[in-house]
Amino acid sequence: MTRLKGHLVRYPTSTNLYTPKRIFVGRLGLNDDLLGGVTSICRTNKIYSGHISVIGAVKNAKLGFYDQSKKAYTGCVVLKRKLEICSMSGNISLKDGEIFVHAHVVLADHSGKTFGGHLMPGAKVFAAEYFILELSGKKLHRVKDPSTGLPLWSN
């Protein structure tokens, strides 16, 4: 740890070195589930560790909110309208031995109002272009972290 302008700065508890392996670029189909579609691509291609980015539009969406006090996803925003995907970013790792995609998204409606949060299953794709960067190195595994209640990387 060190101090930076009066603030305590912690060093990472663990850092792993990765190198790019493969890059997948494509689009999801009309009415595909946004999260399910990306997850399916990762599972089909055996992508165990990586980064995802998506832009496009959805016909609806469901965003999760993690209540830090309750250590649970307690609030979900259900958006039953057409939305632009301004940004979708996430990572790929293993959770309970399965390939797992964790993604957050920022969406905007026709007036420019934005919504953001944890992407939940159920967002129906209108158009979605994805970029998936597979990483070469130690597989990332998620395990429940007792201090947050979240399944976080263990390595």
PLM features per residue range, with description:
Residues 1-101, 106-155:
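N-terminal intrinsically disordered, cationic/polar leader segments
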